[in-house]
Amino acid sequence: MKWLLLLSLVVLSECLVKVPLVRKKSLRQNLIKNGKLKDFLKTHKHNPASKYFPEAAALIGDEPLENYLDTEYFGTIGIGTPAQDFTVIFDTGSSNLWVPSVYCSSLACSDHNQFNPDDSSTFEATSQELSITYGTGSMTGILGYDTVQVGGISDTNQIFGLSETEPGSFLYYAPFDGILGLAYPSISASGATPVFDNLWDQGLVSQDLFSVYLSSNDDSGSVVLLGGIDSSYYTGSLNWVPVSVEGYWQITLDSITMDGETIACSGGCQAIVDTGTSLLTGPTSAIANIQSDIGASENSDGEMVISCSSIDSLPDIVFTINGVQYPLSPSAYILQDDDSCTSGFEGMDVPTSSGELWILGDVFIRQYYTVFDRANNKVGLAPVA
């Protein structure tokens, strides 16, 4: 019996795919460093709302890459045989996998890893085209099948996009090569099977769920666990929240309060839990009020800055979800970078039938270990350890 138990534990551990994430300077920070942010903001209106609920044709998805402006967490995957490595965003707010290819002549591709099908013995071409639109242009490419190495296992026969054009020279400064989407297949452009679905269908993960831990302090230590939960990353028990709409990881918020007073979402509202969005975003009017309450003001770079000395005096902002309170302290919702501090809130307006929509991005996820349960269509949350 003891040996059977040990064997079962070994089998489960082999079906838990652990993908380390590293924290790097964001695209925004790289643009500031290179004196390019003002030019970027002039030519690319940063609109986080355009990522969600796009109007799309059958072969067109709308996934604005400007919305990854502040993303800081990235993982490495390999594609092909032998594997060609790529740095990607593990994004619960989209569903496609795509990387640059050697067919791409855009400046944006020139400083990134590019997939070469000729160097892979397992690549299978298709005649399908992919176009992911955003801003003033679109990422165009083709779809193909190959083996994807993720967390030490081989995801065979995985469909993915190979970019041929990537508009906007700003992507030259992006700290990532491509995107690995972890949302539901219903929002996948071209009907492409997402990576996690393919892993589950092949029996490569032991549970139909995955979880995310984002470290607040270290460049390393963050992780995506495909197929399992690691209780060492959180304290107490997981609280489960039903997914309200299966597409994005969308849930219902009860309210948002400060000092016991409701400041937003007074009658309940919808929220998307999105690892591919760095900040906490909500309706522009509600966010404007919050920025005023915490003393944030816009600087010449379009950032909402705040005095770092305010961190010790400001109150928590509390998100109540499914009857459970999830407080964010000022040190969580105010972002410190050297001697400067910026607000972790950003305004957006998304026209949805469900009304007010919020995005719980990395500012929230850093404080709460998050489980994305596909089997039961639930999101699990617990304070990080």
Curated annotation (Swiss-Prot):
CDD domains: pepsin_A (cd05478). It is found in: Secreted. Disulfide bonds join 104-109, 265-269, 308-341. GO terms for molecular function: aspartic-type endopeptidase activity. InterPro entries: Aspartic_peptidase_A1, Aspartic_peptidase_AS, Aspartic_peptidase_N, Pepsin_A, PEPTIDASE_A1, Peptidase_aspartic_dom_sf. Its EC number is 3.4.23.1. It catalyses: Preferential cleavage: hydrophobic, preferably aromatic, residues in P1 and P1' positions. Cleaves 1-Phe-|-Val-2, 4-Gln-|-His-5, 13-Glu-|-Ala-14, 14-Ala-|-Leu-15, 15-Leu-|-Tyr-16, 16-Tyr-|-Leu-17, 23-Gly-|-Phe-24, 24-Phe-|-Phe-25 and 25-Phe-|-Tyr-26 bonds in the B chain of insulin. Shows particularly broad specificity; although bonds involving phenylalanine and leucine are preferred, many others are also cleaved to some extent. This is Pepsin A. It comes from Sus scrofa.
